[in-house]
């Protein structure tokens, strides 16, 4: 994945699965599989994860879509569903997306989801933009 730190080895995959299981145990949410309706094929993941941003707990909308399906609106559809779930079911006051500045396609998804740049942060030694949307500022779609 182009904007992900690095591909995971076997141990990294096991740790990633364990981390996601813990997220469900602790927060009752995490990442969900993205399944293409027309073929029932796994095409990515999306969901809500708790992130530490400058010492503050934030709920992040995240998404990963298989590269050959980029540009078809799948990430936007998934991000909007996550946004609605976060506000309606989790009653979050704010949702964020952490995005590398050069990841223009992901930035477009965040903007289509009603998000705007809130601040800049460093994560894993790399600059990231924190896109955010507040529940009290409804989105016009």
Predicted regions mapped to residue ranges:
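Acyl-donor (CoA/ACP) binding surface of acyl/acetyltransferases
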Residues: 1, 6, 18, 31-141
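Active-site rim helix/loop that mediates acceptor-substrate recognition in acyltransferases
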Residues: 9-28
């Amino acid at each position: 994945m182009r904007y992900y730190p690095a591909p995971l080895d076997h141990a990294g995959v096991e740790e990633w699965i364990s981390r996601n299981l813990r997220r469900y145990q602790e927060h009752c949410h995490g990442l969900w599989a993205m399944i293409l309706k027309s073929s029932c094929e796994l095409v990515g993941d999306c969901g809500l994860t708790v992130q530490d941003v400058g010492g503050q707990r934030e709920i992040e909308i995240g998404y990963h879509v298989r590269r050959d399906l980029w540009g078809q609106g799948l990430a936007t559809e998934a991000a909007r569903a996550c946004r609605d779930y976060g506000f309606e079911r989790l009653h979050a006051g704010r949702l964020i997306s952490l995005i590398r500045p050069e990841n223009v396609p992901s930035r477009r998804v965040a903007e289509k989801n009603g998000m705007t740049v809130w601040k800049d942060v460093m994560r894993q030694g790399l600059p990231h933009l924190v896109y955010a949307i507040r529940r009290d500022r409804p989105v016009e779609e």
